[in-house]
Regions:
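Active-site acidic carboxylates
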Residues: 1-116
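Glycine-rich oxoanion-binding loops at beta->alpha junctions
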Residues: 119-126
Length: 126
């Protein structure tokens, strides 16, 4: 495998409070695994290594907006995510209530994500 800056990047999915913080709504489900695997620390190490070696870093956030809660069909996990308001935001173009919410970045990642170099993709739903 040839890893080079021309065609290799790091993609981080869902580096958000609801998933990675002890205060997140899914902590009871994922917390033991996150701690055991040192997920938070390893994601940070990965982003720092990529940046220090000048590799692109992409973030794929998970957001739900009020309109998403009216979906007619959804799987078990999607239904649960809506019920516990996981990754909820007040609107597509609004940051009202975003800072520190479950949808916000984990605080320790903010300097790495909000550095003006990291590319944040459009949000995914599933």
């Amino acid at each position: 495998m040839d890893i080079n800056k021309n065609d290799t990047a790091v993609l981080v999915t869902d580096p958000q409070n609801d998933f990675l913080s002890e205060k997140g709504v899914t902590w009871a489900l994922v917390g033991d695994s996150v701690k055991e695997n040192k997920t938070v620390e390893n994601i940070e190490r990965l982003m720092r290594a990529a940046k220090s070696n000048e590799y692109e870093v992409f973030i794929s956030p998970h957001y739900y907006y009020p309109t998403d809660h009216s979906w007619k069909f959804g799987g078990t996990l999607e239904t649960l995510m809506h019920e516990i308001n996981m990754f909820d935001r007040s609107g597509v173009l609004s940051l009202e209530g975003f800072t520190g919410s479950g949808a916000d970045w984990l605080e320790r990642y903010k300097p790495l994500i909000e550095d003006g170099k990291t590319i944040v993709a459009s949000p995914h739903k599933v």
